[in-house]
């Protein structure tokens, strides 16, 4: 039987305050720091900073 992976689901939430988010997963062992990406927010129609928050 395979062991459980070390990956955790995360939510990347827009810093523009629109409430838009992307979901993804990351390996906690290789990247323990919080992720930040410039991604497209369709509500403001611009690329904005998305920061990692825990998926509930």
From Swiss-Prot:
- Give the span(s) annotated as Disordered: 1-27
Gene Ontology CC, one term: cytosolic large ribosomal subunit
Bias category Basic and acidic residues: which stretches? 1-12
GO BP terms in the entry = translation
Print the keywords alphabetically: Ribonucleoprotein, Ribosomal protein
PROSITE patterns cross-referenced by the UniProt entry: RIBOSOMAL_L33
- Molecular function terms, GO-annotated: structural constituent of ribosome
Q: Which family does it belong to?
A: Belongs to the bacterial ribosomal protein bL33 family.
HAMAP family this protein is in? Ribosomal_bL33
| Record-given protein name | Large ribosomal subunit protein bL33
Q: Which organism is it from?
A: Leptothrix cholodnii (strain ATCC 51168 / LMG 8142 / SP-6) (Leptothrix discophora (strain SP-6))
List the taxonomic lineage.
Bacteria, Pseudomonadati, Pseudomonadota, Betaproteobacteria, Burkholderiales
